[in-house]
């Protein structure tokens, strides 16, 4: 992906002190003789990352869709996350093709909108999963009810409507194709649009941080109550609780490590920022879509059973599934 300005500019703004216009659209040759830009090493890396992300999440989507037992609210949320990450992976691959194989700036613009939608939906789905985990512990007695299913559909609708809104904005109007000085670090997204996306991320991250803190308090309180009822040694429930809290810390830490660098850079950078910095911060963000299937799907024992059945060419209809809470996902 070319991160400069002009017709061949795809995502990144380039330059060191001034906007780099590599090709003047008025002087650009037309027809079959038009030369396509050559991909750089990091363009290829992003394309490969997109391919891996697509394969992983396509497997998760296929498992959830093809297994009737996976119709619980928690799997609907995990499925939404997998669809969003699958869309992000496909967007990265198709964006590479649009820039270096087809050379279509219109298609490139649409795909940037698709990527904005996909990544926003991915982050929103993570928030929905966190909310579901919290409610499953806070309202454990009433969690398995029709209200939970309705709430899940409402959360998914809000996530995807909001993501579509933020993704369609640059495609329909709010972009910097006609005014490069208003560009942010990701062409053709304007600086103001990137600021809005960054604010949305920090709001989501803050809510997730607060919810995970509440989850840790609930888990510690439940562990103490169970230990008292079963007359367990304090050390035994302390080890189990510490393990659970460590898992939550890893989940939240991975999310922050993947997205914080790019989000902060979107706020601090502008059209004159070196494109390499955008690649270096965007790549970890794509890795979040790569590790989400591992954290939220492949760790689940029921999903593992289906995977083993697929590998052994066995039917999944006879697999004994057990009821699990969202905190297990």
Curated annotation (Swiss-Prot):
UniProt cross-references to PROSITE patterns, sorted A to Z: G_PROTEIN_RECEP_F1_1 (PS00237), G_PROTEIN_RECEP_F1_2 (PS50262)
GO biological process: adenylate cyclase-activating G protein-coupled receptor signaling pathway; G protein-coupled receptor signaling pathway coupled to cGMP nucleotide second messenger; negative regulation of cell cycle; negative regulation of cell population proliferation; negative regulation of meiotic cell cycle process involved in oocyte maturation; negative regulation of oocyte maturation; positive regulation of cAMP/PKA signal transduction; positive regulation of cold-induced thermogenesis
One Pfam short name: 7tm_1
GO CC terms of this entry: cytoplasm; nuclear membrane; plasma membrane
Glycan attachment points: 20
Lipid attachment points (S-palmitoyl cysteine): 312
Extracellular side: 1-43, 95-108, 175-192, 269-277
Keywords recorded for this protein, A-Z: Cell membrane, G-protein coupled receptor, Glycoprotein, Lipoprotein, Membrane, Palmitate, Phosphoprotein, Receptor, Transducer, Transmembrane, Transmembrane helix
Ranges in the topological domain labelled Cytoplasmic: 65-73, 130-153, 214-247, 299-329
Transmembrane segments: 44-64, 74-94, 109-129, 154-174, 193-213, 248-268, 278-298
GO MF annotation terms: sphingosine-1-phosphate receptor activity
Subcellular location: Cell membrane
Family: Belongs to the G-protein coupled receptor 1 family.
PANTHER family tied to this protein: G-PROTEIN COUPLED RECEPTOR
The protein's role, per its UniProt record: Constitutively active G-protein coupled receptor that maintains high 3'-5'-cyclic adenosine monophosphate (cAMP) levels that a plays a role in serveral processes including meiotic arrest in oocytes or neuronal development via activation of numerous intracellular signaling pathways. Acts as an essential activator of thermogenic adipocytes and drives thermogenesis via its intrinsic G(s)-coupling activity without the requirement of a ligand. Has a potential role in modulating a number of brain functions, including behavioral responses to stress, amyloid-beta peptide generation in neurons.
Protein name from the UniProt record: G-protein coupled receptor 3
Organism in which the protein naturally occurs: Rattus norvegicus
Taxonomic placement: Eukaryota, Metazoa, Chordata, Craniata, Vertebrata
